[in-house]
Each structure stands twice: as C-alpha cells, then as structure tokens.
C-alpha cells in the first residue's frame, strides 16, 4: 500500500434501479428491483451496502471527508445524469444510451474522497530532540528536513491526467495553491465535452469553494462561462451546417 493510499481513499457506491423505456422516456426505480437483482446500493465490489450516499459515514474517527459531498462519476459511456443501461445486472454490457427492449436495468457510480485527519501539534507523539546510539555520538534531529516536509508546495497530480470530472475534483482537492487549481480547471475544460462542461457548471458553487482567494474564484467562474459559451456556439454552428438546405 502506497503512502497516498494510507492517507486517502476514494469511496465508491453504485446505485441500482430497474424499469422500462416507454416512448423514449425512462421509468426506473429501486422499488422495481426483483429478488435476484442486487441491492439498491452496492459497494465497489458489488456487495450489498447498508448505506447510501445520504447515510454513508467515514469508517472511524481517524478519517474525515476530503470532498464536501458525493459526486456522480460522469466518466465513460453514461447519459447526462451518469446512468449506464443494460439488459440485466449479470451481463457486463453497459451503455449510456437507453434502448427499448434492451434496457431494463440501470446503474450509476458515486464517488467521494476521504482522508486521514491531520494531528494537531498537541496530539503529535513526543519525540526527544536528540537520541544517542552510543555515549560518544549523539544524533540530532534535522529541523530543516522536518520543516521541508510540511512546507513542500508541490502537488501530487499530473496535469495531463486531468481529463475526467473525478480527476478534476481530485486535482482541486490535492492542489495547495489556487494557481494550480486554475491550471487543472483550464486543462480539463480544454478537452471536456459539452455535457461535462454543463455538469461542472451546475456544480459550480461547490467547485468554487475549493479556491482560497476571491480573485481566483472570479477567474475560475470566467473560465467556466467562457468555455461553455464557446462549446455551445460551436455546437450551434455544426447544427446549422448539417441542416438541410431548402430547395427552390
């Protein structure tokens, strides 16, 4: 287990529903699940979970939530609400577009990051300022090295990997300064689909809470608005070009 895995963890819950498509409209509910279906909520190993996103808590007091709430994983082949559809839960053939007579069940993935609580100074274990291997050679603790471990401003993520919504959320949480958060947001928006941009904009209020300074929040808001406006304009132009030309 890496140091990152010991100090942070991404909790995963799957939400399951059964239903049917009528005239292109999905009618699904967890109350429609059959006896042989999985539970309404299952964990990352698809084992029935006694909790949902509304009731889940950290496993013990040494953990706390790094993210303020649960997020729908919008990566992969999903619809605008994060659902994947299939013929049955036992078949591993999930798709983001519901198809009549082939979409009787659906699921979506929820994620939330938690982290180990940081000990306050008065909770740190007592360690002597020096210790001795032999009576002749005292070994002094390096205060410079200790400070550097707390003052390191480098982040643990690679900007090139910020191409999905979960990766963006992780980057915003892990970044220590607003400049890095803005770079992560700009990188994501450069490759995001219009649906992803709409989703992020709808979560804008929670997203902006990750920024420390007001001017950074304004800059992030400008990036979101400009990116979505450009994407919508591009989509409109494509639609106009593809529309049939009236014949004389």
Curated annotation (Swiss-Prot):
Pfam families associated with the record: Pex24p (PF06398)
Swiss-Prot/TrEMBL keywords: Meiosis
GO biological process: ascospore wall assembly; macroautophagy; peroxisome organization
InterPro entries the record matches: Peroxin/Ferlin, TECPR1-like_DysF, Tectonin_beta-propeller
Highest taxon of the lineage: Eukaryota
GO cellular component: peroxisomal membrane; prospore membrane
Membrane-spanning segments: none
Function: Has a role in meiosis.
Protein name listed in UniProt: Meiotically up-regulated gene 65 protein
Organism: Schizosaccharomyces pombe (strain 972 / ATCC 24843)
């Amino acid at each position: 287990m890496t140091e990152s895995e010991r100090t942070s963890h991404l909790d995963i819950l799957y939400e399951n529903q059964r239903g049917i498509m009528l005239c292109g409209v999905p009618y699904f509910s967890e109350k429609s699940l059959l006896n042989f279906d999985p539970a309404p909520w299952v964990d990352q190993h698809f084992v029935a979970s006694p909790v949902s996103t509304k009731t889940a808590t950290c496993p013990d007091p040494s953990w706390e939530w790094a993210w303020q709430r649960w997020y729908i994983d919008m990566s992969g082949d999903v619809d605008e609400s994060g659902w994947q559809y299939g013929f049955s839960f036992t078949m591993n053939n999930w798709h983001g577009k519901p198809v009549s007579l082939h979409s009787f069940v659906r699921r979506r993935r929820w994620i939330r990051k938690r982290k180990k609580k940081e000990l306050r100074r008065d909770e740190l274990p007592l360690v002597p300022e020096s210790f001795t291997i032999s009576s002749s050679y005292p070994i002094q603790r390096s205060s410079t090295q200790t400070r550097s471990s707390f003052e390191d401003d480098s982040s643990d993520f690679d900007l090139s990997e910020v191409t999905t919504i979960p990766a963006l959320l992780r980057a915003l949480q892990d970044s220590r300064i607003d400049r890095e958060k803005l770079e992560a947001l700009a990188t994501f928006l450069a490759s995001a689909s219009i649906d992803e941009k709409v989703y992020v904009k709808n979560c804008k209020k929670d997203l902006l809470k990750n920024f420390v300074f007001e001017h950074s929040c304004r800059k992030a808001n400008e990036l979101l608005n400009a990116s979505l406006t450009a994407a919508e304009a591009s989509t409109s132009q494509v639609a106009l070009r593809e529309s049939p030309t009236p014949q004389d």
